[in-house]
Amino acid sequence: MKQGLELKLGQHLAMTPQLQQAIRLLQLSTVDLQQEVQGMLESNPLLDEETGDEGGGGPIPETVELPSEERQLDLAAENILPDELPVDSQWDDIFDMGTSGSGNGSDEDLPDFESRNSRTQSLQDYLRWQADMTHFTADERNMAELIIDAIDERGYLADSLEDLAATMNVQEDALLAVLLRVQDFDPPGVGARNLSECLLLQLKQMVEKDDAHVLLAQRIVKDHLQALGRHDYPRLCTVLGVDEAALRAAMALISALNPKPGEDVGTESTEYVIPDVIVRWAGSRLRTDLNPEAMPKLRINRHYADMAGGKDAAHKYIQDQLNEARWFIKSLQSRQDTILKVARAIVERQKDFFANGPESMRPMVLRHIADAVEMHESTVSRVTNQKYMITPRGLYEFKYFFSSHVGTDSGGSASATAIRALLIKMTQAEDAQHPLSDAEIARVLADQGIQIARRTVAKYREAANVPPASQRRRL
């Protein structure tokens, strides 16, 4: 085998730490970016945050040498958009927050109201606070504590009274007596052992508890909850001996109740979203700008930058920190430019949505925007994830505007988002006693030139949180 040397000329892209940092910054949310910026400010003395009243943030001296590896970013690594989160819905809680029982003891035994209201607390914390305000004997207080610990996040008693009584070696009747008092706590319905009891507790706490409609609602919840779930209204009227008007009034009361009262007491802190982009109407045109509140304002510390010219270890450290700071600022600016460019392309393609609503949403995939801004699809994917725009129609994540398409008779296409909007509009306008089935909705859409299978209608209906026809039927 003959050995030899061969010289080849070629180019390749090295994934430098700076390039990795730029890619990572691009896919961070605004909240995460603020944490990243704060960490960089704490670790790099060459970076300062502009506060708005400082005038020393000008360019650093010309004699300072910049890093030689500055080059155009290529953000072409593959990244797949996360699936949309499923839509979840709950009944609205119509009750005001209150307290039950009467206090006993000295002022120093009372709970700290200010600290209780100034922090997020769990359901158990809230119930213990009410127990502290209730007159219990020492044994009753221990039983109340056991019951509260056994209440799950929905507000239901997760363990049987028999098991709880065996745990404390107390009589089940004594434990039941304490449970009934805990069930008077807020939120209404807490401590229930099943759905029927939960709803009954809420009905019994209504001001008009002796009203005929409330009493009828109690009968339904206690003895006929399954029939109500099946929407068997004729049978309910017959069994209860009431007319449709009375049944309708009782059902309105029941539908206003909360089947999961424990979830009204916050167990998690509120997650805030800072919009990256602001979209507004300027006459008949849409204007898209970066949100100044979301843009980090950084500058180079001039005092330390002037010390970067030496060659000893201390000066080399300062020069390395200066190079890192310059690259970080450059990456932030590149991130902002990319977000704005993608946002403007989205708004331009979906301008009919902003003018007319979701029914006018156009089909759009990553390729459409990537071609418009002359970037790789993976770059657009990173930009659309966890980035938000505040618009005249509300707050939207960038990826909301991307959806698949369905063919039309005219040879065009309709956005899946627009079809969901049409579906919601049809179900809202339907006859309540004869709601549209999925097959009927498919036929109505076909009459409008949109060819869609019944199974696809069912998928879009579920995504829009619209129940099936059997559950939408009302009196």
From Swiss-Prot:
UniProt KW Iron keyword: no
Pfam families found in the cross-reference section: Sigma54_AID, Sigma54_CBD, Sigma54_DBD
GO cellular-component term (any): DNA-directed RNA polymerase complex
PROSITE patterns from the UniProt entry: SIGMA54_1, SIGMA54_2, SIGMA54_3
DNA-binding region(s) in UniProt: 365-384
Keywords: DNA-binding, DNA-directed RNA polymerase, Nitrogen fixation, Nucleotidyltransferase, Sigma factor, Transcription, Transcription regulation, Transferase
InterPro entries: RNA_pol_sigma_54, RNA_pol_sigma_54_core-bd, RNA_pol_sigma_54_DNA-bd, RpoN_core-bd_sf
Motif RPON box location, chain numbering: 453-461
GO molecular function, one term: DNA-binding transcription activator activity
GO BP terms: DNA-templated transcription initiation; nitrogen fixation
Annotated segments matching region Disordered: 42-64, 95-115
TM regions (residue ranges): none
Entry-linked NCBIfam families: PRK05932.1-2, PRK12469.1, rpoN_sigma
Protein family per UniProt: Belongs to the sigma-54 factor family.
Protein purpose: Sigma factors are initiation factors that promote the attachment of RNA polymerase to specific initiation sites and are then released. This sigma factor is responsible for the expression of the nitrogen fixation genes. The open complex (sigma-54 and core RNA polymerase) serves as the receptor for receipt of the melting signal from the remotely bound activator protein NifA for the expression of the nitrogen fixation proteins.
Name of the protein: RNA polymerase sigma-54 factor
Gene: rpoN
